[in-house]
Amino acid sequence: MSPLIVGTLIIILLSGLATAFYVTWQGRLICAGVGLILEQAYEGGQMFNTLMAHCFETYNGVEKSGTQCVADWLKVGLLAVTFGAGGPRLVNTLGGSSPTTKRVIYIVMILLVLITLAVNLKH
């Protein structure tokens, strides 16, 4: 698979994990509208297509390269996609009935968010 597809799939996975932190603790009210849109896209099986379409949008009239697209998502897109509505279900599925496991998942998500912010601020 191409680096663009692999990068996009990784971002979908990471953003899905980070979603639960934002929606559960921080962004339920602020991001309800964005979350609803992303949830509908996800439920319709269109999340991947939505991300791919974003990658090939033009920026100042110049088509983005695959590398630039992945960089954009790592810097900014991950934070935006994390406002989706699917995260709590994912945490419940991964964590089962163990509160400890769920806490570990939340800690990982917080770290992902901090890394994303650091990458964004660095650029």
Swiss-Prot record:
Predominant location: membrane
Protein localization: Cell membrane
Record membrane topology: Lipid-anchor; GPI-anchor
Signal peptide range: 1-20
Keyword line: Cell membrane, Glycoprotein, GPI-anchor, Lipoprotein, Membrane, Signal
Residue ranges crossing the lipid bilayer per the database entry: none
Entry annotated with the keyword Signal: yes
GO cellular component, one term: side of membrane
Domain of life: Eukaryota
Lipid addition sites, GPI-anchor amidated glycine: 96
S-adenosyl-L-methionine in keyword set: no
Residues excised as propeptide: 97-123
Full protein name: Uncharacterized GPI-anchored protein SPAC750.07c
Record lineage: Eukaryota, Fungi, Dikarya, Ascomycota, Taphrinomycotina
